[in-house]
Amino acid sequence: MKNNTGYIIGAYPCAPSFHQKSEDEEKAFWRQLADTPDIRGLEQPCLEHLHPLGDEWLMRHTPADWQIVVTAIMETMRRRGGNGGFGLASSDEEQRKACVAYYRHLYQKINAINAANAGKIVALELHAAPCASNPNVAQATDAFARSLKEVASWDWSCSLVLEHCDAMTGPAPRKGFLPLENVLETLAGYEISVAINWARSAIEGQDTTLPLTHTRQASQAGKLGALMFSGTTLNGEYGEWQDLHAPFSPFCAQSLMTHTHVRELLACAGSDALQFLGFKLLEINPDADVNHRIAILRDGIAALNKAQQ
C-alpha cells in the first residue's frame, strides 16, 4: 500500500548528517521524523548514494511506505564548484556530457531501487544548469535540448520533473540556471513537468510576487507538476536573498515566506494534478539539537496544513 497523502519533505538540510554530526544523532533525527504525521515521503539528494551513510541505511531508518523524490541539485552544485561548466544546459560540450553521465548514474540507481522496492522513488528533479561563464541563453537552451533528448529517451521507472531555479538573467543570480520561458519551450514535446520552488523564484527577481507568476506560467503551459516551499530572507542568519531554505514566517522571524504565499500558489495550481507538494528547509545552526531540527520541519507541515484550511 503506497502512501499518496501528505507532503514530500526536503528534510536533509535539517539532518545532523548535513553538519557531519554523529550517527546516533542521525538515527534520533529520523526516528522523530518517522513519528511525525502528514509526511508522504522525502526529497533526497543523490551524490554517489541517497544518504551519506548509504542507500540501505536510509531505507532502514525511514518508514517503508515513505516515497522518495530524488533531487540532482546538491551533486550538480558540488560539481559546479570544481567546474562551472558542469550542467545539462552547458555550452561546454565536455562538461555537458559529464553531466549526462551523472544522470545515467541516477537512472541506474533509481531503477535498481525501484526494482527492489516497487514505486519507492516517484520522481527525479532535474536542473537546467548552463555554463557559468557563458551568459548566452540561446546556447544554453540548445545545450539543454540536446541533453534532454538523450536523458528522456532512457526507460525511467519514475517521473521526471524539472525544478526551476533562479535564472541566469536575474539581477543577482545564485544558481543562475535557464530562464523559465526557455525551460517551458524546451519541455514542450516531453512528458516532463516543472516544479516551482518558492524561494528559487523569489530570489530570481528579488521579488516575492514572482513565485506566483512562475506558477501561473507553468500552469498555463500545462506543465505545473510540483510546488516546493523554501524561504528566503533580507537579513539575519539566512542572509540577503540567499538560496538557504529559510523556514516559514513567523517561525523564522526574518523569513519572507508566509502562509499567504502558500495559499496563493495552491489557489493558482487549482485543479492541476500536482505530482507532489512539500517543502525543503535548512537548520542554519550546525550545533542545533535534534529537537530544534525536527521543530523546523514540523512547523513546515503545520504551515502547509494551515494554508489549506
From Swiss-Prot:
SUPFAM superfamilies listed in its UniProt record: Xylose isomerase-like (SSF51658)
Induction data: Up-regulated by L-ascorbate and repressed by glucose.
Result of knocking out the encoding gene: Does not affect aerobic growth on L-ascorbate.
Pfam families: DUF4862
Family membership noted in the UniProt record: Belongs to the YiaX1 family.
Biological function: Member of the yiaKLX1X2PQRS operon; however YiaX1 is not required for L-ascorbate utilization under aerobic conditions.
Name of the protein in its database record: Uncharacterized protein YiaX1
Organism of derivation: Klebsiella pneumoniae
Lineage, top ranks: Bacteria, Pseudomonadati, Pseudomonadota, Gammaproteobacteria, Enterobacterales
Gene: yiaX1
